[in-house]
């Protein structure tokens, strides 16, 4: 799957001093200079099987706690989405600047941080609802690109990444070509089938390990899939976690 950047606009309402609610979001309002020893990277990957407002709401609800943490501790954020076609990149979450909210007053800082995370969540909502969703596709391409995305951030001038969290929204119920190792068309729900599928992913190097980088799968079993599909997705998550990272859940 070829990565073709598609810059998205940040269209959100007027919190934290933005005068014109119809104007694009000025993401620099939520960014600070990173310390000399660097900052963590939050890499958000969105594998979208639909772009409904309901799905957008679920995605933003699950990602917002990670945005809260990033704004509290100071983190770079990079976001990549795919609905089965080309990759979409957010010009807000590009990974080149550290996001952080700091204030002299603790109560004010917490209030502004929560407000900022809600504003930034609307960028994610916008990306989900505007993403073109193909009838076929899987998370394989996004997982395959993790190391490249991390390296792209690390190679950015004046950016120093000291640890990585990869946040993956996916239902793990991809459909596509037979060559796609995570194509679950016609597959029964069993641990052995999930193990065979994931083993093939790594043997064919469609997916490779990210080593010690932290990986968190969200979105599994949160849609309208039936029980056998939910079981298969859960088994696939377990097998992927066993192979993709030493810190995965």
Give residue ranges: language-model regions.
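Catalytic metal-binding/acid-base residues of hydrolase active sites
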Residues: 49, 172-173
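Post-signal peptide N-terminal segment of mature Sec-exported envelope proteins
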Residues: 19-40, 44
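C-terminal motif of bacterial Sec signal peptides marking the signal peptidase cleavage site
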Residues: 6-9
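Hydrophobic beta-strand segments of well-ordered beta-sheets in folded domains
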Residues: 36-44, 73-79, 164-166, 206-221, ...
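Bacterial signal peptide processing site
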Residues: 11-14
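Von Willebrand factor
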Residues: 38-162, 165-167
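VWA/integrin I-like adhesion module and closely mimicked acidic/polar interface patches used
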Residues: 21-22, 173-230, 234
